[in-house]
């Protein structure tokens, strides 16, 4: 039985949705998950997020919260007694938010052209993405996780890289996160994906691979 009033409106292949699931699982919160067909959005989704009409949406006691990073912070604030997601120190919290925003604004944008480009354009996109990830990697120096000795807010925000990027690399033939170029990031991939709470929420890799292959073919033929 899911905890009263806790529901996640998501989409199985969305790396933004999995952030919410990881946060809830780390906190030990049971929830109902509703997988949305984004080509035919449900009345529930449109009612709970009429502004952007996007997933994820967390519905808690009938009140909707949208946008994945905002939802993760909300979860940490509501279920205070569980696993700490945000750092306790104000400065460390600010740093975590800074790097999360950097990853959202810069790294995500740098990675997308790899998926949509070929040839020289793709090689340029790979280089630019690697430079962005190298900057992000500095936040890992001397640490096991971005959160320190344990997974924290920034790990949750960028955690999708560990599962989705290898899929994107296979689909596109590009090599982005390598031991040579991004050794700390590559090692973190392994540590992060080894965690039971992380693995439990991951979408099936073969299904994700097939979906991304189909999507890329569609984009390249457009």
Curated annotation (Swiss-Prot):
It is an enzyme of class 2 (transferase). Its EC number is 2.5.1.18. PROSITE patterns: GST_CTER, GST_NTER. One of its GO terms (molecular function) is glutathione transferase activity. One of its GO terms (biological process) is glutathione metabolic process. CDD domains: GST_C_Tau (cd03185), GST_N_Tau (cd03058). GO terms for cellular component: cytoplasm. Pfam families: GST_C (PF00043), GST_N (PF02798). It catalyses: RX + glutathione = an S-substituted glutathione + a halide anion + H(+). Residues 4-83 form the GST N-terminal domain. Belongs to the GST superfamily. Involved in multiple disease resistance (MDR). This is Glutathione transferase GST 23. It comes from Zea mays. The lineage of its organism: Eukaryota, Viridiplantae, Streptophyta, Embryophyta, Tracheophyta.
């Amino acid at each position: 039985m899911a905890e009263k009033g806790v529901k996640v409106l998501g989409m199985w292949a969305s790396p933004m949705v999995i952030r919410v699931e990881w946060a809830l699982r780390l906190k030990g919160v049971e929830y109902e998950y509703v997988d949305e067909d984004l080509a035919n959005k449900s009345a529930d989704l449109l009612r709970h997020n009429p502004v952007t009409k996007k997933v994820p949406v967390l519905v808690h006691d009938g009140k909707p919260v949208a946008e994945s990073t905002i939802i993760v912070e909300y979860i940490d604030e509501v279920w205070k007694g569980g696993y700490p997601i945000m750092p306790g120190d104000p400065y460390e919290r600010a740093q975590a938010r800074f790097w999360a925003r950097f990853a959202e604004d810069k790294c995500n944008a740098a990675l997308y052209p790899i998926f949509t480009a070929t040839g020289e354009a793709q090689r340029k996109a790979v280089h630019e993405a690697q430079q962005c990830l190298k900057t992000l990697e500095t936040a890992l120096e001397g640490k096991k996780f971005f959160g320190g000795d344990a997974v924290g807010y920034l790990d949750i925000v960028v955690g999708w890289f560990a599962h989705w990027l290898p899929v994107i690399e296979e689909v596109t033939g590009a090599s982005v996160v390598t031991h040579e170029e991004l050794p700390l990031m590559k090692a973190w991939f392994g540590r992060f994906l080894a965690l039971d709470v992380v693995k439990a929420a991951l979408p099936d890799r073969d299904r994700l691979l097939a979906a991304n292959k189909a999507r890329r073919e569609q984009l390249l033929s457009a």
